[in-house]
Amino acid sequence: MYRSNFKPGSTRWAVRRAQWRSMGIREEDMHKPKIAIINTSNKLSCCYIHLDELCRIVEQAIRDTGGLPFEVRTVAPSDFVTSAGKKARYLMPTRDLMVNEVECMMEGAVLDGMICLSSCDKTTPAHLMSAARLNVPSLLLTCGYQIGGKCSKDKFDDLFFDIDDVYEQVGALATG
């Protein structure tokens, strides 16, 4: 028996069953291990832009191995986006918020395990902190690097730049 399988006839069992059956979850799937896919995807940063596609692959893999997947979205701190406003004061609190969000969703829904799609230097520690606090079977998938951009100005035509190149050039410009 999985921790997510509530006692038949209990209030929690009835409410969950009503909610999930209305979402199209079949009766025979109700007894499977319920696995969260923690997805930090958003369209604010290139760190996360590819995670929705990976999430679909992970969902199918969970189904193929006898589990019931649930995508769970969280806030996604990114140094380059979150630090843009108010002198970066949201960066570390956002990481901690993410830990709390994961814990609330996992414990609130009483899910059996989680697979975390991690793709930034703040999401990885947050996922590891969540796994340690929750003490449920957890897998952290590091999902790749930031894609670079292509410059299309005069002498830089067809050159690719990553974020480090941008910082170096801004620094060079600032120092003359």
Spans of features found by a protein language model:
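Glycine-rich phosphate/diphosphate-binding loop of Rossmann-like nucleotide-binding domains
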Residues: 27-31, 36, 42-73
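N-terminal amphipathic/basic leader segments beginning at the initiator methionine
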Residues: 1-32, 56
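Predominant activation on well-ordered alpha-helical scaffold segments within soluble catalytic domains
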Residues: 17-20, 35-38, 52-59, 63, ...
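Hydrophobic alpha-helical scaffolding
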Residues: 5-9, 44-48, 88-92, 117
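Gly-rich Lys/Arg/Thr-decorated short loops/hinges at beta-loop-alpha junctions or inter-strand turns
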Residues: 1-4, 35-42, 75-88
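Active-site cavity-forming subdomains of large catalytic enzyme subunits
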Residues: 91-176
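Generic beta-strand/beta-sheet core signal
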Residues: 38-40, 72-75, 117, 141
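Glycine-rich oxoanion-binding loops at beta->alpha junctions
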Residues: 15-21, 68-116
